[in-house]
Each structure stands twice: as structure tokens, then as C-alpha cells.
């Protein structure tokens, strides 16, 4: 049998030209460079945990890792106890009642949720309202999926809340989705 040594260049999808490098990816590189130069940097970047979990949490994780029933896929909607716990937390902290069976979907992260919501509700060419400043993923995923991003400003003097009067005066006829963060972003 003859061995073939051939390399194929696989070009990225054209849609990637519509986005730039993730904002926090660039910032983390800048922070790493500054640290390498011996500068004392206080990172105000992504909310990556900087403290280990409690001993009780680590012990519980270790104990559960030994459970032979704990290694399979979980239900797509998450386990009921988790969804109920989320609903109780929202009620306690925000006074918001959520139905754990129909209004809560555990995810592996916000990017997964933003992707799924955009795929489910927005067609290419439709518009999406994105807060400025806001989470960069709203813009990057919207662009990758072929939607038109319309920014709306969040201002400190307005408590970082949307100016609904300004929004009402805009042509929103093609807007399919409005991204918001609550309590708010930036936090």
C-alpha cells in the first residue's frame, strides 16, 4: 500500500469574515503580555473564578464522581431539582416567579444559549437589537448567522437601562430579537 503525504488546505467559511477576534480573547493576550513584562495587572476581564471551590463542594464532587449512575448524559432539559433550584434562587434574589418546567433551560454557558435562541428565532437578513456596551457574543454570533446588528446605547446616567423612548422612534420593522442583560451588562 502506498502512503500518501498530501496536505489539503480547508478554507474557513465565508461568514467568518464578518467577525473579528473575540474581544476578551484579545484582552487576555494583552494581559498575558503585560504580566510577562513584569507589570502588575488587575484584570477586569471575564469573570473567571479566582478562588477554588469550598472543601465541601470538592468533597461532594469527588463523592458523586464515584456514583456509577452519574456518568451518562443528563436530560436535555436538566434535572428537575436543578431547575427548581434555579427558580427558587430567582424568586429569592429578584422576586421573579419562573416555571421550572417551561421557563428554565440549564446550559453549558451563555454562548450556547445565545446561539440557540438566535438560530430558533432569527433568519438571515433580519435585524437584532444589541446593547452597547454589551456582551460581545451578541454581536459576533448575530453576524456569523447572517443577521443585521442594530446597536442601542446604554448610558450610565440612565442606570445602564435601554432608552425605550428612543427605541420607539426607530424603525424596528425588521427587528426580530432584542438582547438585554439583567441585572445589566456591564455589571
Functional labels for PLM-detected ranges:
Residues 144-149:
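A short helix-loop-beta submotif of the ANL/AMP-binding
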Residues 150, 154-187:
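Active-site phosphate-binding strand-loop segment of PLP-dependent enzymes
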Residues 79, 110-111, 135, 160:
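Conserved donor sugar-nucleotide recognition element shared by glycan-biosynthetic enzymes
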Residues 120-142:
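Conserved PLP-anchoring active-site segment centered on the Schiff-base-forming lysine
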Residues 49, 111, 182-185:
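Short glycine-rich anion-binding loops that position phosphate/pyrophosphate groups of nucleotides
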Residues 98-104, 124-127, 174:
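Short acidic capping loops at alpha-helix termini that bridge into adjacent secondary structure
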Residues 3-10, 17-109, 116:
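N-terminal small-domain helix-loop-helix segment of the aminotransferase-like
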Amino acid at each position: 500500500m502506498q502512503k500518501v503525504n498530501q496536505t489539503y488546505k480547508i478554507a474557513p467559511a465565508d461568514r467568518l469574515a464578518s467577525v473579528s477576534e473575540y474581544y476578551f480573547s484579545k484582552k487576555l493576550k494583552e494581559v498575558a503580555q503585560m504580566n510577562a513584562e513584569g507589570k502588575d495587572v488587575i484584570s477586569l476581564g471575564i469573570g473567571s473564578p479566582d478562588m477554588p471551590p469550598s472543601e465541601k463542594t470538592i468533597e461532594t464532587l469527588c463523592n458523586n464522581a464515584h456514583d456509577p449512575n452519574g456518568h451518562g448524559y443528563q436530560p436535555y432539559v436538566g434535572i428537575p431539582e436543578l431547575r427548581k433550584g434555579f427558580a427558587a434562587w430567582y424568586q429569592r434574589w429578584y422576586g421573579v416567579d419562573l416555571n421550572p418546567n417551561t421557563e428554565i433551560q440549564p446550559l453549558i454557558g451563555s454562548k450556547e444559549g445565545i446561539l440557540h435562541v438566535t438560530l430558533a428565532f432569527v433568519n438571515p437578513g433580519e435585524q437584532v437589537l444589541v446593547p452597547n456596551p454589551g456582551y460581545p457574543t451578541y454581536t459576533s454570533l448575530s453576524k456569523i448567522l447572517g443577521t443585521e446588528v442594530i446597536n442601542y446605547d446604554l448610558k450610565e446616567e440612565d442606570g445602564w437601562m435601554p432608552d425605550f423612548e428612543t427605541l420607539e422612534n426607530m424603525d424596528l420593522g425588521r427587528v426580530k430579537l432584542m438582547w438585554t442583560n439583567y441585572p445589566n451588562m456591564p455589571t
